[in-house]
Amino acid sequence: MRMLLHLSLLALGAAYVSAIAVQSPMNRLVAETLALLSTHRTLLIGDGNLMIPTPEHNNHQLCIEEVFQGIDTLKNRTVPGDAVEKLFRNLSLIKEHIDRQKKKCGGERWRVKKFLDYLQVFLGVINTEWTMES
């Protein structure tokens, strides 16, 4: 019996470790994009004279359109080349993913109970994951 318990715990630990090691394709894309951004930061800054509107709000989820407008401005003012092509391609893929996710915001009509359940989860996310400003 004790051996069975040890084997079960060992299997559970192995499953946990393998679940941590597996990242979603979007997580890998974002990680790669962050690395590319860090690598090419100096090239993107250039002479430092380009002015791009930057949101003041700390809740990045609320400023997605402004962020991607800034990316478009940066892309249009950056000399094309192999060095930054992958970065802008990745950013484009991230935007496409976000746009697909936003299409899921429109939903069917359901009874009020289902909406209230959704609202409760939504408020929980705001309470725990968003930076609250005064």
From Swiss-Prot:
Query: Keywords in UniProt for this one?
Result: Cytokine, Disulfide bond, Glycoprotein, Growth factor, Secreted, Signal
Signal peptide location:
1-19
- Which InterPro entries does UniProt cross-reference here? 4_helix_cytokine-like_core, IL-5
Q: Does the keyword Signal apply?
A: yes
Cellular component per GO? extracellular space
Glycosylation, residue list:
N76, N90
GO function terms (MF aspect): cytokine activity; growth factor activity; interleukin-5 receptor binding
Gene3D superfamilies tied to this protein: 1.20.1250.10
Q: Name one GO biological process term.
A: immune response
As for subcellular location, the record says: Secreted
Domain of life of the organism in this record? Eukaryota
Record's keyword annotation contains Disulfide bond: yes
A Pfam cross-reference name:
IL5
Q: What does this protein do?
A: Homodimeric cytokine expressed predominantly by T-lymphocytes and NK cells that plays an important role in the survival, differentiation, and chemotaxis of eosinophils. Also acts on activated and resting B-cells to induce immunoglobulin production, growth, and differentiation. Mechanistically, exerts its biological effects through a receptor composed of IL5RA subunit and the cytokine receptor common subunit beta/CSF2RB.
Q: Which family does it belong to?
A: Belongs to the IL-5 family.
Q: Which PANTHER family match?
A: INTERLEUKIN-5
What's the subunit arrangement here? Homodimer; disulfide-linked. Interacts with IL5RA. Interacts with CSF2RB.
Record-given protein name: Interleukin-5
| Annotated organism of origin | Felis catus
Q: What is the lineage of its organism?
A: Eukaryota, Metazoa, Chordata, Craniata, Vertebrata
The encoding gene is IL5
